[in-house]
């Protein structure tokens, strides 16, 4: 047991250095995209979002969504899935657990 602990202590700095070296470029890439993608909308973008929602409601009322190409339908489905998953992640964070609320 003592030899195992000694080997672990000897290898720890090398493992930490390898982990830091491996993760630095990936962390930089993550921060780059996080700063761009996770910013709240500006006041100038809100009217465009409202127009987009009105367009979706209008297409549902008139049935024009049936004229979408397969590519557009798949992209719309992916966006809807992303929105639902972010909602679900927020619920998990709010509940502090995957299943149920603490009562």
Swiss-Prot record:
GO MF annotations in UniProt: proton transmembrane transporter activity
Disulfide bonds: none
BP GO annotations: proton motive force-driven ATP synthesis
Modified residues (N-acetylalanine): 2
Keyword annotations: Acetylation, ATP synthesis, CF(0), Hydrogen ion transport, Ion transport, Membrane, Mitochondrion, Mitochondrion inner membrane, Transport
Pfam families: ATP-synt_G
PTM sites of type N6-acetyllysine: 11, 24, 35, 54
Localisation per UniProt entry: Mitochondrion; Mitochondrion inner membrane
Annotated Gene Ontology cellular component terms: mitochondrial inner membrane; proton-transporting ATP synthase complex
Annotated family: Belongs to the ATPase g subunit family.
Subunit structure of this chain's protein: Component of the ATP synthase complex composed at least of ATP5F1A/subunit alpha, ATP5F1B/subunit beta, ATP5MC1/subunit c (homooctomer), MT-ATP6/subunit a, MT-ATP8/subunit 8, ATP5ME/subunit e, ATP5MF/subunit f, ATP5MG/subunit g, ATP5MK/subunit k, ATP5MJ/subunit j, ATP5F1C/subunit gamma, ATP5F1D/subunit delta, ATP5F1E/subunit epsilon, ATP5PF/subunit F6, ATP5PB/subunit b, ATP5PD/subunit d, ATP5PO/subunit OSCP.
PANTHER family named among the record's database cross-references: ATP SYNTHASE SUBUNIT (PTHR12386)
Function: Subunit g, of the mitochondrial membrane ATP synthase complex (F(1)F(0) ATP synthase or Complex V) that produces ATP from ADP in the presence of a proton gradient across the membrane which is generated by electron transport complexes of the respiratory chain. ATP synthase complex consist of a soluble F(1) head domain - the catalytic core - and a membrane F(1) domain - the membrane proton channel. These two domains are linked by a central stalk rotating inside the F(1) region and a stationary peripheral stalk.
Official protein name in the record: ATP synthase F(0) complex subunit g, mitochondrial
């Amino acid at each position: 047991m003592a030899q195992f602990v000694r080997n672990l202590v000897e290898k720890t700095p090398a493992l930490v250095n390898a982990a830091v070296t491996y993760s630095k470029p990936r962390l930089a890439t993550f921060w780059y995209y996080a700063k761009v993608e996770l910013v709240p909308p500006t006041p100038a973008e809100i009217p465009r979002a409202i127009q987009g929602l009105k367009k979706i409601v209008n297409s549902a009322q008139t049935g024009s969504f049936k004229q979408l190409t397969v590519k557009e339908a798949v992209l719309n489905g992916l966006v809807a899935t992303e929105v639902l998953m972010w909602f679900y992640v927020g619920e998990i964070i709010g509940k502090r657990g995957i299943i149920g609320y603490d009562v």
